[in-house]
Amino acid sequence: MTGGDIPRPLSDIERDVIARLLSVPFPGRDELRAQLPFATVEGRCDCGCVTVNLAVDRAAAPATVLSGAPVSADISDDEFYAGIVLLVDGEGYLCCLEVYSIGDEPVRRLPPVEQINARPQR
């Protein structure tokens, strides 16, 4: 789950997608938002999808969340349906932007944020 361009800063679209996920209220959201400027990409999925592993500088404060997957989203358009989950490690730091497909093909590009319907986990 690494490549020649890893580690690297978040791309604009990765940052925008995470910000969209963090736009819905849930416990720990504000702390996770504050981690975003400290987040970098440290790995990616080998299947070719756009899932990325994240690392956060520990200078940022950890978040207290109710689960390791505090927020998720549906992505849909006329051609496909998929999902996104923002994962948090056991120490309270962003650790993965997981993008999964409901179909056979992996999601190879992040969608426009307008197509992301975020919701907190219950």
Q: What label would you give each PLM region?
A:
Residues 76-122:
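Short, compact, well-ordered microdomains
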